[in-house]
């Protein structure tokens, strides 16, 4: 059970990845979580993320490699936010090949920019990793996390439309070539990201259960 989940900013990758990992008992590896942790102590990464730009391939690959080596991935894993470039894809292939591990499926959650921007603008998060939406998935108590009671906030790269548009543009330029790569390899599965969160979850779960 080894999977990759792709999609533009605001597609709901992180939300779905966490739920899928719990349901099937596999490891969730999120580069987004890794970056947000790293930016606390690395000013260069912080500046890149705040401007909507991609972190250099060498840094990303090294972070993922360390995380894969640190965790037991024999039971399966779900990569969320990686790979994002053709170079990262090649590095991932080499990493997995050395361990005789293969990717079973690549899920692409597809949503247009307008919908993604709307979702991002309303997204609020907690330091514990929980994510909410002011309209679509509000917390039980305004401004307070249901999981730990922490204060909810907007991520810095979610606040300005120009940054959101830049992030989407970077995705279009850097990540879309991967779609063709995984399509040609027969691993790509399209997921309609405009459906409800529960419907998207059921669609991905169904594909995994059916061995697609």
Swiss-Prot record:
Region (LID): 122-158
Keyword Kinase listed: yes
Major location category of this protein: cytoplasm
Record CDD domains: ADK
Any one Gene Ontology molecular-function term assigned to this protein's record: zinc ion binding
Binding positions (ATP): 10-15, 123, 131-132, 195
Subcellular localization: Cytoplasm
Region (NMP): 30-55
Domain statement: Consists of three domains, a large central CORE domain and two small peripheral domains, NMPbind and LID, which undergo movements during catalysis. The LID domain closes over the site of phosphoryl transfer upon ATP binding. Assembling and dissambling the active center during each catalytic cycle provides an effective means to prevent ATP hydrolysis. Some bacteria have evolved a zinc-coordinating structure that stabilizes the LID domain.
Job of this protein: Catalyzes the reversible transfer of the terminal phosphate group between ATP and AMP. Plays an important role in cellular energy homeostasis and in adenine nucleotide metabolism.
Protein's name according to its UniProt entry: Adenylate kinase
């Amino acid at each position: 059970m080894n999977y990759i989940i792709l999609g533009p900013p605001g597609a709901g990758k992180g939300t779905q990845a966490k739920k899928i990992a719990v349901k099937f008992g596999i490891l969730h590896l999120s580069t987004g979580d890794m970056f947000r942790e790293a930016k606390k102590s690395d000013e260069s990464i912080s500046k890149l993320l705040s401007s909507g730009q991609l972190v250099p391939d060498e840094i990303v690959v090294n972070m993922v490699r360390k995380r894969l080596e640190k965790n037991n991935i024999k039971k399966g894993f779900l990569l969320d936010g990686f790979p994002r470039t053709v170079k990262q894809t090649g590095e991932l292939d080499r990493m997995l090949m050395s361990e005789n591990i293969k990717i079973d499926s690549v899920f692409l959650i597809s949503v247009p920019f307008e919908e993604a921007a709307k979702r991002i603008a309303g997204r609020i998060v907690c330091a514990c990793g929980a994510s909410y939406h002011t309209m679509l998935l509000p917390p039980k108590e305004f401004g307070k996390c249901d999981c730990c009671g922490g204060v909810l906030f907007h991520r810095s790269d979610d606040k300005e439309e120009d940054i959101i548009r830049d992030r989407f543009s970077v995705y279009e330029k850097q990540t879309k070539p991967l779609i063709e790569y995984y399509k040609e390899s027969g691993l790509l599965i399209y997921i309609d990201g405009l459906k409800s969160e529960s419907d998207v979850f059921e669609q991905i779960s169904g594909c995994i259960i059916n061995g697609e």
